[in-house]
Regions:
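Low-complexity, glycine/serine/proline-rich disordered segments
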Residues: 1-63, 181-197
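Generic detector of well-ordered secondary structure
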Residues: 25-28, 110, 160
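Hydrophobic, Leu/Ile/Phe/Ala-enriched alpha-helical segments that form helix-helix packing faces
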Residues: 39-43, 54, 112-116, 158-165
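RNase H-like nuclease fold core
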Residues: 40-98
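Exposed beta-strand and adjacent loop surfaces of beta-rich binding modules
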Residues: 51, 129, 169
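Short HxH-centered metal-ligating active-site micro-motif
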Residues: 85-139
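Active-site or metal-binding loop neighborhoods of secreted/extracellular toxin and effector enzymes
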Residues: 123-125, 133-197
């Protein structure tokens, strides 16, 4: 069996206080804003949106912070455009116009796919939660959400990622600013191509 030789910990042996750098505890509500602040500082992008970060509890990937930026953010940071950097990426926007493609969520999704592949995990072995936080107070745009509420629409990047890993729960949250109208969705959970919460 694949688990042969592995030590199995009893529940009382597990240190529930210890968390790895990338693991998100349910009560840790500041991880997203904190990671966005660090990313803004690292990339030298103090105000422009959209940036996105994600963390997971999947064994072997829990120490990774997945990072992404919109085309405007990547340009301001002096980073290559996604179409230049990763033209053959696994997850691509279903948007038909340039402004509806290469969003921060797609950037994060592709970093996650690359990490899964590097870890040698099959799509079915990807079990757990991916917490994604994005900086735009308007919420995740309709193009990135495409197909989640209507299977007749083309699949956006969130649905593509979710269907690729059917055992992965994707919990998305967004920066919220009083007075800013939400035009997409701010906080939601997706699994296997559908909203679950």
């Amino acid at each position: 069996t694949p688990d042969a030789g592995k030590k199995v910990q009893k529940p009382e042996e597990v240190d529930t206080e210890a968390t790895k750098a990338g693991k998100v505890e349910e009560e840790d509500t500041n991880w997203g804003p904190d990671e966005i602040s660090r990313l803004r500082e690292d990339w030298g992008v103090p105000e422009t949106d959209t940036l996105a970060v994600a963390k997971t509890d999947i064994e072997g990937l829990e120490d990774i912070v997945f990072k992404g930026g919109s085309p405007r953010v990547r340009k301001e940071a002096g980073l290559d455009d996604l179409d230049v950097l990763k033209p053959d990426r696994a997850i691509k926007s279903s948007g038909k116009i340039a402004s509806a493609t290469r969003h921060a969520e797609a950037d994060v999704a592709n970093e996650f796919v690359e990490a899964v592949e590097k870890a040698g995990l099959s799509n079915e072995e990807v079990k757990g939660v991916l917490h994604l936080y994005q900086s735009n107070p308007s919420g995740v745009c309709p193009t990135c959400l495409s197909g989640l509420g209507n299977p007749d629409k083309a699949s956006g990047v969130i649905k593509q990622l979710s269907e690729r890993y059917p055992n992965l729960k994707i919990k998305v949250s967004s920066n919220q600013v009083e007075g800013v109208r939400v035009t997409g969705r701010s906080n939601f959970t997706v699994q296997n191509g559908k909203y679950v919460d």
